[in-house]
């Protein structure tokens, strides 16, 4: 009888271990929606052709030590076109391009590698995986069948290099589930005691929502370190961005005849 009880106990523990293991690798699908705001530019006719928001389908692939956040297989690129009143200036902002946005997090080494592109040039931004100062509350909801807990923190966005602007603060609200016991989440939002399924930034100006959780897919080939682009630090990338945007502004202000630009927001 004792032997039978021992076998039953071993069987229960084994099943529990298998179930727990199954919760530490898989894929979470998300939708991202960002409300768009444009500063008025004299002579540039934004009119009704500008969308009120931009959306994207994303996927988070993960195991116990790694997470990769990138475009979902069904993601469709969007282009935004702007034209001056006299037709002498045209600009196209493209969400697609030669370099896909990929955020690779090494959870064990606490390192991050972000592959992105701007104006046709590719970059690999290397940084430490910094832990946000989350405040975990007692508030709970059920989402996609998971019990989720609310966490909040204030995100500080530094000013553009060389500008007189002040830092901008944005409140971030996240809902994470301890039922998926990994510090993962969409985009930069993670480092909580469970996977983040919902994110709201700046009172809903950006919203990220999980649409499905899949523990059955083989995600081995997705957990690959991105390699495209020039390796830069976050500060170096911000400096490059500032210089390129200044160049665009000068070209627009000093334009002669017809000018056009294509900006790839990869």
Where are these regions (language model features)?
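Bacterial Sec-dependent N-terminal signal peptides
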Residues: 1-28
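Extended soluble regions of mature proteins
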Residues: 23-266
């Amino acid at each position: 009888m004792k032997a039978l009880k021992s076998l039953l106990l071993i069987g229960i523990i084994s099943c529990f271990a298998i179930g727990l293991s199954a919760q530490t690798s898989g894929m979470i699908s998300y939708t991202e929606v960002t409300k768009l705001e444009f500063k008025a530019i004299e002579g540039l006719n934004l009119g009704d052709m500008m969308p009120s928001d931009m959306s994207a389908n994303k996927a988070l692939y993960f195991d116990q030590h790694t997470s990769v956040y990138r475009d979902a297989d069904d993601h469709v690129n969007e282009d935004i076109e702007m034209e001056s009143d006299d037709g002498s200036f045209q600009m196209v902002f493209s969400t697609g391009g030669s370099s896909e946005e990929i955020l690779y997090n090494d959870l064990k080494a606490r390192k991050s590698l972000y592959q992105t592109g701007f104006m046709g040039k590719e970059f690999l931004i290397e940084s430490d995986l910094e832990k946000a100062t989350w405040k975990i509350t007692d508030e709970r909801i059920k989402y996609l069948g998971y019990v989720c807990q609310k966490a909040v923190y204030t995100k500080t966005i530094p000013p553009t290099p060389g500008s007189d602007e002040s830092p901008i603060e944005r409140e971030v609200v996240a809902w994470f589930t301890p039922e998926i016991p990994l510090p993962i989440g969409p985009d930069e939002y993670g480092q909580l005691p469970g996977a983040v399924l919902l994110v709201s930034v700046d009172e809903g100006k950006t919203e990220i929502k999980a649409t499905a959780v899949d523990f059955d897919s083989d995600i081995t080939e997705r957990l690959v370190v991105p390699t495209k682009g020039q390796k830069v630090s976050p500060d170096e990338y911000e400096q490059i961005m500032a210089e390129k945007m200044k160049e665009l502004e000068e070209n627009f202000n000093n334009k002669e005849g017809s000018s056009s630009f294509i900006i790839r927001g990869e």
